[in-house]
Amino acid sequence: MSPQTETKASVGFKAGVKEYKLTYYTPEYEVKDTDILAAFRVTPQPGVPPEEAGAAVAAESSTGTWTTVWTDGLTSLDRYKGRCYDIEPVPGEEDQYICYVAYPLDLFEEGSVTNMFTSIVGNVFGFKALRALRLEDLRVPTAYIKTFQGPPHGIQVERDKLNKYGRPLLGCTIKPKLGLSAKNYGRAVYECLRGGLDFTKDDENVNSQPFMRWRDRFLFCAEAIFKSQAETGEIKGHYLNATAGTCEEMIKRAMCARELGVPIVMHDYLTGGFTANTSLAHYCRDNGLLLHIHRAMHAVIDRQKNHGMHFRVLAKALRMSGGDHIHAGTVVGKLEGERDITLGFVDLLRDDFIEKDRSRGIYFTQDWVSMPGVLPVASGGIHVWHMPALTEIFGDDSVLQFGGGTLGHPWGNAPGAVANRVALEACVQARNEGRDLAREGNEIIREASKWSPELAAACEVWKAIKFEFEAMDTL
């Protein structure tokens, strides 16, 4: 190649690394109503300025790459690039910053949580210039929200289907979670539903194992549902876990549930994936099935305070992808969950419009434009003594799920269900009478136990059980 040719080729083009902040840090930018906004907790490597770190996040999660490329000139980067438009230090933390990034809506495929996350939380989380990176919150614009179906049915439709109003719904996870035969499993389902629960549940890892194939479980659980309905006069359900190794097999299991006439199926949405979850949510709406969502694997993503993704983002994504219930922590049980932060994402699941509230970890105002809400499920290490607190914290639009707190009753499964139903009814009545559940909760349970021997026995068994560990999910 002649020197003259080299000179011509280099005119107006200099390959090499340039600072991201020159292109992607734009503090003068005014965000648009159609932008997706993200709040990242950024921990830069030593010597990397926060402006460069924030700009790197914006670049690597949108149009940027490590060097100047010829094809930048073939499109309008100014139209498509992400922009870091604000940076603030994290109070009480050294070298941590909240970096706000705006993404043009054209970067994302309509109706695809999968595509949205592939961009926003894709390769950028392995970027060497950052010691750690956490996505704290997203503002999803109404223009993008309207491209999603959302939950198959929503809270009001579920209440109408079940004919249950004015109280939280009661559930129970069948234990032991693995090892029971299908017939013994169905027996436990029947006893719990007959005792007064609204729902029973497959555990998240109950799929189709050698000791209990899925079709056998579905048949025995359906029999338990219809038998308990006939005896109690109440509509009952069991979360039949349709999660499978392929989307085709998952839909086949959901079709079987529909043909059996049961009201609800279940999916592990993180291990199953958002594409599978959205497909199942569409099937459930088309065929009148409610959809219970388990969040198995969430703590791998959201437990660390400085890296990963907060559960409020996963909760928003689930509402978009589709689900009628989702596990959301308990505040008082064995699983992670600080009260204000938990109630923040519970409101994001249920309400139509949520104002920005940094005290609860909500970084952006979110408008769901009438997308149906999702019932939060409180589950994990809870028992009858927790009932007043759970009723006060979560309110009526929730599912309170007692696994060991039902099946661990000294008299058996049905008395365990009776104890929970009596405790719930007592708390709801006391609240409706104007009593303070937070202050008088234990007294309310003691009063109810005087006329319910099942509740009295449960109170005695679990009177000393506490899970007193400091929550890691703090602001």
UniProtKB/Swiss-Prot annotation:
Mg(2+) binds at residues 201, 203-204. One of its GO terms (molecular function) is magnesium ion binding. Residues 1-2 form a propeptide. It comes from the Eukaryota. Binds 1 Mg(2+) ion per subunit. The disulfide bond which can form in the large chain dimeric partners within the hexadecamer appears to be associated with oxidative stress and protein turnover. Its cofactor is Mg(2+). HAMAP family: RuBisCO_L_type1 (MF_01338). RuBisCO catalyzes two reactions: the carboxylation of D-ribulose 1,5-bisphosphate, the primary event in carbon dioxide fixation, as well as the oxidative fragmentation of the pentose substrate in the photorespiration process. Both reactions occur simultaneously and in competition at the same active site. The basic functional RuBisCO is composed of a large chain homodimer in a 'head-to-tail' conformation. In form I RuBisCO this homodimer is arranged in a barrel-like tetramer with the small subunits forming a tetrameric 'cap' on each end of the 'barrel'. Belongs to the RuBisCO large chain family. Type I subfamily. This is Ribulose bisphosphate carboxylase large chain.
